[in-house]
């Protein structure tokens, strides 16, 4: 393939994966061994078109050392303009969560849910009922009281997240199958409801 491409043609590369946890210099060197073309990183780290009920705004890690090794780095956006401003700010700087929260007027309560919106690669510990309740207590601040254009973008994701937490709480409390089924069928698709009830 490398022999058939005009050497002046710029190659866009996402790393070793379509959504890469990191893009190390070693992987870039392997690509440069195959192609002499200019390379632009097309980074899907913040993209959410493959997981439309989620978004990620955590630190842009595992690829910052590449800026001088390639022609450019493009960030694949979410399509949510205010969210994308955060992603661009994250990729262009080392701002702390606190700085991001202040810059974009995000309520401090978001700190409790941020781990679930940080990265597609973050493994989080299981929650017990106390932990679920602690996160559910942020619902009113983030879904009812907070008013901004950013909140309007995040509202569907936050509501879905809290809905999933309510489901987890019901499962952990061993609610009867009838009660769980009645609750599920009004909130989740039929195939998912049947899968949850089967398990």
Go through each PLM region and give its residues.
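Catalytic-core regions of glycoside hydrolase
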Residues: 1-97
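C-terminal functional modules
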Residues: 96-199
């Amino acid at each position: 393939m490398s022999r058939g491409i005009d050497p002046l043609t710029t190659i866009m590369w996402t790393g070793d994966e379509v959504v890469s946890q990191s893009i190390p210099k070693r992987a870039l060197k392997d690509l440069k061994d195959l192609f002499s073309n200019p390379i632009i990183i097309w980074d899907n780290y913040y993209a959410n078109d493959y997981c439309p009920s989620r978004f990620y705004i955590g630190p842009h890690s595992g690829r910052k050392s590449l800026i001088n090794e390639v022609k450019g780095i493009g960030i694949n956006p979410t399509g949510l303009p205010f969210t994308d401003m955060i992603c661009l700010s994250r990729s262009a700087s080392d701002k702390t969560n606190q700085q991001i929260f202040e810059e974009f007027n995000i309520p401090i309560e978001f700190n409790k849910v941020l781990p679930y919106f940080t990265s597609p690669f973050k493994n989080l510990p299981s929650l017990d009922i106390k932990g679920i309740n602690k996160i559910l207590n942020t619902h009113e601040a983030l879904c009812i009281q907070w008013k901004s254009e950013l909140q309007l973008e995040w509202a569907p994701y936050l509501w879905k997240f809290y809905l999933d937490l309510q489901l987890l709480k019901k499962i952990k409390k061993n609610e009867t199958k009838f009660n769980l089924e009645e609750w599920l069928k009004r909130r989740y698709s039929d195939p998912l409801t049947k899968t949850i009830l089967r398990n």
